[in-house]
Amino acid sequence: MKLTEQQIRFFDIFGFLHFPGLFANDIDYITKSFEQIWVDHNSSNQGKVHDGNIRSTIVPFIDQNEYLCSLIDDQRLDGIATTILGNDYNYVSSDGNFYVGDTPWHSDFSRPKKTIKIAFYLDEVTKDAGCLRVIPGSHKIGDVFATLLKETIVTRDPNETLLLGIQPNEVPAVAL
């Protein structure tokens, strides 16, 4: 899959792309593979299971499942990565999560080298429950806006009032 010129321009300006249904035909097997990693992890982790009280994370994640790992080479993902990063891009890491509550806004990367994050949401999410919120332009590391944003609103406490006098969930963002 090659991105269109419009998609590339959109990404360069806003810092994100959204592909709902891109893996619609594969999502059942992706979900089963995701769940199997958790079953395997729980059996080797003194039986600890996600109890729904706090976020649970496994890192690295897809590396533990041959099928999920093969998605890195799937033409849909590889095409996106190649178009944005070039043919010599490097896969760095993966994580699998069960989320609980809100996650405060944060920047995933602060490296000067162009990076992307590709995420699969296996549960239904809405703008009010669980979705990813993207602040357009926040991806431009070193940019005045991105720097001011990071200095002003990065918090680990979702109930903390920001320097702007608003709650973290009130920061203007695009809900995906």
Locate the predicted segments by residue.
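Non-heme Fe(II)-dependent double-stranded beta-helix
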Residues: 1-14, 18-114
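Hydrophobic alpha-helical segments
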Residues: 29, 34-40, 120, 137, ...
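Short, charged/polar surface micro-motifs in flexible loops or helix N-caps
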Residues: 87, 99, 124-127, 140
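Short, structured patches in soluble enzyme cores that scaffold and shape functional sites
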Residues: 95, 107, 120-124, 136
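Glycine-rich, charged/polar anion/phosphate-binding loops
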Residues: 104-105, 119, 169-170
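Short, conserved beta-strand element in jelly-roll/cupin
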Residues: 112-127
